[in-house]
Each structure stands twice: as structure tokens, then as C-alpha cells.
């Protein structure tokens, strides 16, 4: 299995439960594991009945398992502050207040949330994953996740254009220098070029890691809405040149015993039959294989039940 494992899917299908169960399974197999939530709902804390922050902390009762929850709002503020500090060092004092004003306005603009969250989880992959054999990501609902995963290519192209424009600008300043006059800007040691180059390397790492060192699984429920959403998600991954390793069917209805014939038993049999039809559709029409089928429990999946679910996750 790849070092980085992502679980995605439609909201409410049980991504967090599956992510935490898989992380528990890995830890129980002596695979040092970190589970990371990028979902604003912060349900990882609820599953383990333990509060987590943006630094890895040991999960009580599970040796070899740490957890952390990335807060998108905190990450956005941190992201904007880093930009503010970086630009303040490279522009005149007269422009600093205008930069601050523009950054405050950008707080609620489309893409700001995704950019900050993207930086956060790639930083985890790049800088905080060394102590671990495996890092499991419990992601936000499919649409947000696909936008995140598409950022390396989009922002990489954008950075390339900025680098080109900056080099053009410096080249003009160098050519405009007269006689022995020192040009106002030099290519070597230019702080803007250096910052852009670091961002380019960051995006290149992210794209390479997600294509070559990450496995993506989609969690679905056995209903038509979830199946349709999963189909669109698979198409979205394919468009981004990312392969979905497998599908996990969650919240399946347990079949009643053969000798049960009451109204409830008849209802359950009909529901089970409908769900089997949906799973048959998934097997026939989708390229990624169905790698696990997890039945619903009568109680919330927490504590001991998490290990019970983990036993069904042979992925």
C-alpha cells in the first residue's frame, strides 16, 4: 500500500468512520499511522472521543496511532499572514497598507479556502509524515476534495507564468542599466524569484506525491444518489490523472435470519435486495473494484466497534 491513503466520497456516507477504522487496522498491524482530518466537521475527535488539534497527538487506547485535525479557518488566517509577511519584505512601505487591505478582501474569495487547506495537507505530507509509515486522510465531501486535488496542476501553470513575467521584468531592468550603473534588479538573489521557485517546487512535490505515492478510495452507500455521486467522482479523478484504487460500500443493511417472517423482516429483505442491485451496478459499471462491504451497526461506530469495522476493511 502507498504511504498516503485518501478516503473520499459524498457527505454523510461514513468517510470518517472508514478512515479511522482503516487507520486503527494499520496501527494494530504495527504500521505507525497518522490519521488527518481535512473536513471542517472534525468528526475524527468524535469517533475517538478525544479532542485533536493541528498537531499530531496519540490516540488513547490505540498504540502506534496519532491523529490531527486541520482547521480550515485557522489555516486560511495562517496562509494570509505568511503571504502578508512575505510581500511586506519585498515592496515599499507605502504599499504595505494596500496589500493588507487586498488580503483582507481575499479572505472570502472563491479558492482562498481550498488554497489554504491545500497548503496545510501538503505540508503534512512533506514535513510531518517522516515519523509515520502511513498517513490516512479523512477528506471533505467530494466536490471540495476534487478542487483541492486539482490545484497542483492549476497553480503550477500559474506559477510558471509568474516566473516567466518576473524574469522578463528583471531582464528589462538589467538591459536598461546605463554604463556602470547597477541595475535596480538582478536575476541572482531576487527574493520574488526565489519565493516563486519555492512555490513551484511545493506544487511539483504535491503533484508527484499524489500521482505516485498516494492511494485514493471512495466511500459510498448502497443508494442511487451515492452511486451517481461516486460515478462523477471517478470521472473527476480520471480528469486529474489520478486513479481511484477501490470503492468501499458502507452502511449496508444486515439481512434478517431465514426463519424471521414478520413485517420488519420483509422490509429488511426488500431493502437488502435493493442494495444488492445497487452494488451489482457498481461492480458492472465502475472500473475501480469494490474492495470492502461494511454493514450498519445498531450503535455508533466508536471504541471497540471501530476495531470490528476495521476487520472488514481488507484494503
Regions found by a protein language model. Give the residues of each.
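Terminal disorder- and signal-encoded targeting elements
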Residues: 1-3, 26-29, 315
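The Walker A (P-loop) glycine that initiates the GxxxxGKT/S ATP-binding motif of P-loop NTPases
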Residues: 9
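Hydrophobic positions on the alpha1 helix immediately C-terminal to the Walker A/P-loop
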Residues: 17-18
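N-terminal phosphate/diphosphate-binding loop that engages ATP/GTP or pyrophosphate donors
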Residues: 21-95
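Phosphate/Mg2+-binding loops and adjacent switch elements
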Residues: 91-218
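C-terminal lobe/tail of nucleotide-utilizing enzymes
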Residues: 200-217, 221-315
